[in-house]
Amino acid sequence: MPFVNKQFNYKDPVNGVDIAYIKIPNAGQMQPVKAFKIHNKIWVIPERDTFTNPEEGDLNPPPEAKQVPVSYYDSTYLSTDNEKDNYLKGVTKLFERIYSTDLGRMLLTSIVRGIPFWGGSTIDTELKVIDTNCINVIQPDGSYRSEELNLVIIGPSADIIQFECKSFGHDVLNLTRNGYGSTQYIRFSPDFTFGFEESLEVDTNPLLGAGKFATDPAVTLAHELIHAEHRLYGIAINPNRVFKVNTNAYYEMSGLEVSFEELRTFGGHDAKFIDSLQENEFRLYYYNKFKDVASTLNKAKSIIGTTASLQYMKNVFKEKYLLSEDTSGKFSVDKLKFDKLYKMLTEIYTEDNFVNFFKVINRKTYLNFDKAVFRINIVPDENYTIKDGFNLKGANLSTNFNGQNTEINSRNFTRLKNFTGLFEFYKLLCVRGIIPFKTKSLDEGYNKALNDLCIKVNNWDLFFSPSEDNFTNDLDKVEEITADTNIEAAEENISLDLIQQYYLTFDFDNEPENISIENLSSDIIGQLEPMPNIERFPNGKKYELDKYTMFHYLRAQEFEHGDSRIILTNSAEEALLKPNVAYTFFSSKYVKKINKAVEAFMFLNWAEELVYDFTDETNEVTTMDKIADITIIVPYIGPALNIGNMLSKGEFVEAIIFTGVVAMLEFIPEYALPVFGTFAIVSYIANKVLTVQTINNALSKRNEKWDEVYKYTVTNWLAKVNTQIDLIREKMKKALENQAEATKAIINYQYNQYTEEEKNNINFNIDDLSSKLNESINSAMININKFLDQCSVSYLMNSMIPYAVKRLKDFDASVRDVLLKYIYDNRGTLVLQVDRLKDEVNNTLSADIPFQLSKYVDNKKLLSTFTEYIKNIVNTSILSIVYKKDDLIDLSRYGAKINIGDRVYYDSIDKNQIKLINLESSTIEVILKNAIVYNSMYENFSTSFWIKIPKYFSKINLNNEYTIINCIENNSGWKVSLNYGEIIWTLQDNKQNIQRVVFKYSQMVNISDYINRWIFVTITNNRLTKSKIYINGRLIDQKPISNLGNIHASNKIMFKLDGCRDPRRYIMIKYFNLFDKELNEKEIKDLYDSQSNSGILKDFWGNYLQYDKPYYMLNLFDPNKYVDVNNIGIRGYMYLKGPRGSVVTTNIYLNSTLYEGTKFIIKKYASGNEDNIVRNNDRVYINVVVKNKEYRLATNASQAGVEKILSALEIPDVGNLSQVVVMKSKDDQGIRNKCKMNLQDNNGNDIGFIGFHLYDNIAKLVASNWYNRQVGKASRTFGCSWEFIPVDDGWGESSL
């Protein structure tokens, strides 16, 4: 059944019922206007609003000083009958579109039921309609009747795009927020919509270059209807409660105050800006106002001004407010019913939720300000339908929201030229200095007279920097706890499933009837709603700066389109000063190639190479090793946006590694929590039941405090950190598009330089080029979004949540003292309950409440990031041992106690690598808290660790199983043990039934993947199925364990070589984790990838690769050979020689010799690296050791051919020969420790990866660009893959 009563035409004759001339309150001597009653309590007036407020009767533009920041004026709009007919049909179509969704049906039903409360009488025992909630309807005979209504849709006033919801009057600011409510009118037009820019995401793949989008007008109308619903129910937030921004710094958005009412109406992230303390304040305030309504109904003895009965109206308001009624007819507010209604009105009815139901793209935040206005016509179904909106399935406009794309579906959108938007309001950012020559003329912000380089920055381009005034902080208040203290139920986060539950329980029947109202004065007069005082943004304020900003760097990437060639440069300053020069953060190699003019016959190859290089540049990432933190860094973000004045990719990466996410933030958020107020607990003399209840209430209130602080923390994070990250995301999209625009312009310019004959011989299409560049940007944005989401979550989890937890633990300690004293003081009453209650207090307050982001945020991207890198791993970890602050600690947030023996050793370079030797004092004991010893050992659990097991050297090691990790107590639990060539996992139940899963490896192989090499071990246990062991992320062995009984694990875990016969035996171990779930294969792989720390290069054994340390070399393509030197000097060469020798001990091991051949030493190219660790993309020199003397690996780049033969040269003789090597690390066929060395010439151009080439059966070492082109095209290992082998005690071979 449709929502609109019937199909109306503007020229339909009036009937005094649903088509009539009406007069509205406060209209003075207004002429009656034709109106259409589209549904009970809802009217539409297809006229410009010149009568609701006499001060707004002029449709002409006001003086500029009084214009609001976003405005559009056209006094002729809606002046003809055809326009009014189109308006009427457009509005009714939008109502039907809204009503066609479950959420829309609920909202419109709530509006129809939301009859303003009858509080118009001065006598508290009477109910009387408030006159300004009525209209006067002119009858066909010229008489009039008064009719109560809830909502009027009316055309806009002078500013056509000023859509808003207002009240007709009569002290409305009180009525809309005192629980009564008042009749609402919405200024709206279905003929206009707003443009916005968003990165479109489909299955997490951002689609860029898709143009600007237009808002679905059904979303806009739904937004205003939500305001109307808030105001009809009297729960609108006071307009004085606003979210303020700081405006002092150059980077801060100016003159913006967003009302809490707007944030709540939008929903999503924005609603979270209202902190939990203020939200609780609002909820309690309106709860009390609803109780006032119930009290008024209970007092009412009569009703006046209507033929309706008192009981009927009481039932109407009972239905509206979900009041409870006892047998005597007395009304009350049931807290659970109120909470359900309040959640529906304020959290379920939001713009953000409507977007999901409409299946449209929309601005991600209320702060995404309108950047364009479009004229539309939604009445024809070929343009817009009730079901699909603009995204019509039959017209191929449903994919990627193409129907809302104003460029793809351009016929439906006419952009208005005289729209005054926020871009008219700007700041002037000036860098001091002398401008020596002509500058760009992109805008008037370049002020040469002052010798300053100035740019205009649009207000909406700046950072949203929230003021501390937004965040209340009443957490320090002392709270009284009694036996009757109200305990709040845990809130559910809004989801589509929750909305569907509300829909299924929503009663759509019993719609209120039209009530006969006693005729009021023909001109109803009330009190006008005050107009908000809107001030223009401070315009053109000048800031003198000492450095270039993000906004300068973005401006430097732009260029003037003209007849001259565009030049790319790595200097932002040069680009700012020259009209035809654009700044790029791509490599100098790219700059050199793109700036080079080419002949016509080379054009296609040149253009294709540029596209290929563009993809390489944009997809560059550096990987990290921090679980639940940052796993990748996009290194060019720093130089692209001058983040932290990072002028190079290396500086940016190092800043993230060593200082963390704070390097990304323009302003460091202030986040402070007070010392939380403890509890004042009320005593009950000789009443055990009330005393115990009071203790339980105190513990429950303690849990509420944790939840409240977590929610408060998330609010601060979203407003102060995530908004910054989102702006960087937006600007990086713009930066990549700038690079693509410059690349296209240069290629197109070069093409246009050729003759027509030359062009005819070139198969070139600029659209194909654009498509390929956009594909590259799409791929790059996946990495950028992943990195930025991880940055945001990382700051929350590493900077804000730990601080909150520390404060909460202090609070717990104070609560413990209070409660234990309370128990002691009441011991005479509690008697036998004393010990139980003390244990309950101690156990509850010793356990932290884990933080779950999903309780407070419903953003899918952030939750996915949180889930993938935190929730699925870290939040299931009950033990995570790492080295930090000169000690081993448990990072799982459960704080296990760790006792370390005297003979436990740490690696000097990576202190997470722990050495345990075969001595009693070489022991690590981990004690889990009693409150954390979990029952999961009866269910599912997993463990993971890295281990390096030295070679077994003698027969004493044969058949000698010894334990290294033991969690068995009273003959039940689990352990990890080793034997010759075996890693063994043992589960033992309390009846001593045993199951073992084993990883076996052989020592009788030439080159082993496991002997003395770091191995990643994961063991998972599903009590209903199997126990499994994974090595380096691969499943090795599995055994059924469903037959095992109860397994009572100890709360102590011992790391020790127990039962080993070899006194010289030792092991290395790191990153031990215990999880209370069965990890799946993806989680194991993610854990392996993360902990592999692929941003740092490794040697053969898996240790960090180091500068100034000698290494033997192993080529992975031909591992049976080693590197040797023929002769020193440029005429000499280096080559692969073989085979390797063998090291044999009967029945123990048979291996190839590894310490053979010429040694390489990696030397620093620059002095910036201070920790001696070689990282991915480090630029280095390679020295080779011949007869104990170091020479430099180099080549003459001018050699003929692709392969450049490498030589070992006296270091002073290198001169201008090529010697700089870029170190590369990437997983290759599952080999984690392999490296590539990319040799470059003195201009930074690639000569090629170092490998070998056969010359007369001699495998000479060369640098070849052939490798660079092949790597990535095929998955096999090439001859440019190497491993660096240092001498290691665990291998046992004598070095040369």
UniProtKB/Swiss-Prot annotation:
GO biological process, one term: proteolysis
Segments passing through the bilayer: 627-647, 656-676
Disulfide bond sites: 430-454, 1235-1280
Swiss-Prot/TrEMBL keywords: Disulfide bond, Host cell membrane, Host cytoplasm, Host cytoplasmic vesicle, Host membrane, Host synapse, Hydrolase, Membrane, Metal-binding, Metalloprotease, Neurotoxin, Protease, Secreted, Toxin, Transmembrane, Transmembrane helix, Virulence, Zinc
Listed SUPFAM superfamilies: Clostridium neurotoxins, 'coiled-coil' domain, Concanavalin A-like lectins/glucanases, Metalloproteases ('zincins'), catalytic domain, STI-like
Reaction(s) the record says it catalyses: Limited hydrolysis of proteins of the neuroexocytosis apparatus, synaptobrevins, SNAP25 or syntaxin. No detected action on small molecule substrates
Its EC number(s): 3.4.24.69
Start and end residues of each stretch annotated as C-terminus of receptor binding domain (C-RBD): 1093-1296
Notes on activation and inhibition: Protease activity of LC inhibited by arginine hydroxamate.
Short sequence motif Host ganglioside-binding motif: positions: 1264-1267
Site (Transition state stabilizer): 366
GO cellular component: extracellular region; host cell cytoplasmic vesicle; host cell cytosol; host cell plasma membrane; host cell presynaptic membrane; membrane
Active site: 224
Region (Translocation domain (TD)): 449-870
Name of the top EC class for this enzyme: hydrolase
Region described as N-terminus of receptor binding domain (N-RBD): 871-1092
Gene Ontology molecular function, alphabetical: metalloendopeptidase activity; protein transmembrane transporter activity; toxin activity; zinc ion binding
Co-factor(s): Zn(2+)
UniProt similarity note: Belongs to the peptidase M27 family.
Subunit structure: Heterodimer; disulfide-linked heterodimer of a light chain (LC) and a heavy chain (HC). Interacts with host synaptic vesicle glycoprotein 2C (SV2C) which serves as a coreceptor. Also binds host receptor proteins SV2A and SV2B; glycosylation of host protein greatly improves the interaction. Part of a crude toxin extract that includes BoNTA2/NTNH, P47, OrfX2 and OrfX3; OrfX1 was not detected. A purified toxin complex has NTNH and dichain BoNTA2. Forms a highly interlocked heterodimer with NTNH at pH 6.0, called the minimally functional progenitor toxin complex (M-PTC).
Other comments on record: There are seven antigenically distinct forms of botulinum neurotoxin: Types A, B, C, D, E, F, and G; new subtypes are quite frequent.
Protein name: Botulinum neurotoxin type A2
